[in-house]
Amino acid sequence: MAVVTLAEMMEAGAHFGHQTRRWNPKMSRYIYCARNGVHIIDLVQTAVCMNNAYKWVRSAARSGKRFLFVGTKKQASEVVAQEALRCGSSYVNQRWLGGMLTNWTTMKARIDRLKDLERMESSGAIAMRPKKEGAVLRRELERLQKYLGGLKNMRRIPDVVVLVDQRRETNAVLEARKLDISLVSMLDTNCDPDLCEVPIPCNDDAVRSIQLVLSRLADAINEGRHGGQDGRGDDGQG
C-alpha cells in the first residue's frame, strides 16, 4: 500500500518547486520539468522516496530511536508541533538556538530551568514573590517556553532529526551532521540531497505539503513504536 498517492500530493501542491534560477543541480534527478520559470518535482520519485522514508522511520522507531522535528518558518511551525506531539517526539518550531545539539549540556540546563519555573508558577511560588521579581520570572518563563517548550521531554540528543526546509535550518543540519545524527529531510528544488540520509523531494513551502509529509512520518513513528501493520510503505517483498 502506497504511503501517499499522486492525487494527494497534487492536491497538496507538493510538486511545485522554486524558480529555475534558484535550483540546486543536485536535485535534477527529482525534477520532472520546468514550467513558466518554475521547476516541477517528479511526484513519482516523491512517492518512491516517501515509501522508503516511511519504512526507514518505522524501523528506526521500532528499534527505540528518538526523533526531533525541526521547522521554524511560519508555514511549518504549527504542523511541526502538532505532528511531533502526536507521535511523542520533541520539536523546535520557533527558532534554532545555536548549540541545541552540539552544546547539549548547556541546553539541558536551560530546559531544567524551564521545568523549575513551570513548577514555581503552578505552585503559586512566583505569585508570592515581590511584583517586580515575579514579572521578571514570568518573562523568563515565557521566553523559555517559546523556544524550548518542545524539548522538555528530550533527555538526550536525538537519534534522528526530521527537517522542514533544509536551506532555512542550516545550523540544525550542521549540528546534526557534526554529531552523526541521521536526517530525514523534505527537499525543495533549491536543497542538497547529499546532506541527508533520507530525502523526500517535495514542496517545503506549502502548508498542505508539509502537513501531508509530516503526518505520514508521524504515522510511521507511531506504528514502529506501538505496533500495528497497515501495510503502508510495503511493496509485498517483505
Swiss-Prot record:
The gene is rpsB. PROSITE patterns: RIBOSOMAL_S2_1. GO terms for biological process: translation. SUPFAM superfamilies: Ribosomal protein S2 (SSF52313). Gene3D superfamilies: Glucose-6-phosphate isomerase like protein, domain 1, Helix hairpin bin. NCBIfam families: rpsB_bact. GO terms for cellular component: cytosolic small ribosomal subunit. One of its GO terms (molecular function) is structural constituent of ribosome. Keywords: Ribonucleoprotein, Ribosomal protein. Disulfide bonds: none annotated. This is Small ribosomal subunit protein uS2. Belongs to the universal ribosomal protein uS2 family. It comes from Synechococcus sp. (strain CC9311).
